[in-house]
């Protein structure tokens, strides 16, 4: 080990935590940056657990910045990570009983909050909204198809449970979330 030329301490706080301390709030999700996003989500939904709003607010930021940097939803690599982030946010929206496309609308609120700091976010706003809306529509179609296949399997087997093999097929072949199959 060698001494640093300028000794310092890294608290590992991150920008959101520093903002929370500076704004006198106890949670990163109570800072001004998240407040408007969370309020926008609440305006589109029924009352629900705070964790749903926080996940959606966090995931719209991640999704928008990934798309801004050239990533699009895909079945592999970075695109797969983006797809999973978007779909996880959508599932939290469904838990809040939001039934129509909503996630892409949050890009507008995000660009109001962060567009000055990140001008590229403003420049690509319409593109980001389009990509997210397309993924929302694709996921809605996936869910509809999965529910149809699931119902057909229940009708065919006349059982209360489906096989693990069929559940995996729904997930692997059709992209139907395993947790929704379990429900």
Language-model features, listed with the residues they occupy:
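A glycine- and charged-residue-rich anion-binding loop/surface
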Residues: 1-183
């Amino acid at each position: 080990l060698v001494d640093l030329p300028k000794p310092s301490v890294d608290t590992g706080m991150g920008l959101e935590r520093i903002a929370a301390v500076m704004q006198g709030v106890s949670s990163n999700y109570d800072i001004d940056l998240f407040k408007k996003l969370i309020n926008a989500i609440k305006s589109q939904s029924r009352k629900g657990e705070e964790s749903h709003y926080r996940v959606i607010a966090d995931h719209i930021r991640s999704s928008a910045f990934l798309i801004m940097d050239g990533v699009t939803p895909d079945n592999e690599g970075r695109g797969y990570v983006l797809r999973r982030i978007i779909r996880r946010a959508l599932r939290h929206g469904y838990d809040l009983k939001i039934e129509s496309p909503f996630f892409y609308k949050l890009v507008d609120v995000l660009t109001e909050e962060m567009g000055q700091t990140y001008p590229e976010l403003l420049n690509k706003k319409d593109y980001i909204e389009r990509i997210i809306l397309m993924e929302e529509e694709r996921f809605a179609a996936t869910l509809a198809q999965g529910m149809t296949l699931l119902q057909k399997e229940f009708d065919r087997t006349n059982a209360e449970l489906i096989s693990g093999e069929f559940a995996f097929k729904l997930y692997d072949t059709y992209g139907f979330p395993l947790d929704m199959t379990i429900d």
